[in-house]
């Protein structure tokens, strides 16, 4: 099966969506998750987005502790 066929496979798409919905950012950033699902973002790209948002959240928490 080549890459184009696997991208069109409904079971692969279902797994991609399920992984996105169960991600660590699904509660904090539901709009990002929905946009990624709608635009059929690959899991690799989604994981990069997720990592960046988690890092951003962690940096903001550290900053808020210093400011408070």
Swiss-Prot record:
It comes from the Bacteria. The keyword Signal applies. Residues 1-28 form the signal peptide. Keywords: Signal. Encoded by the cryptic lambdoid prophage DLP12. This is Uncharacterized protein YbcW. It comes from Escherichia coli (strain K12). The gene is ybcW.
């Amino acid at each position: 099966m080549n890459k184009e066929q696997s991208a069109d496979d409904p079971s692969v798409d279902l797994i991609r969506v399920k992984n996105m919905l169960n991600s660590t950012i699904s509660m904090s950033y539901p709009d990002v998750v929905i946009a990624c699902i709608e635009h059929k973002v690959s899991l690799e790209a989604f994981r990069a987005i997720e990592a960046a948002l988690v890092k951003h959240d962690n940096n903001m928490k550290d900053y808020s502790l210093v400011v408070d």
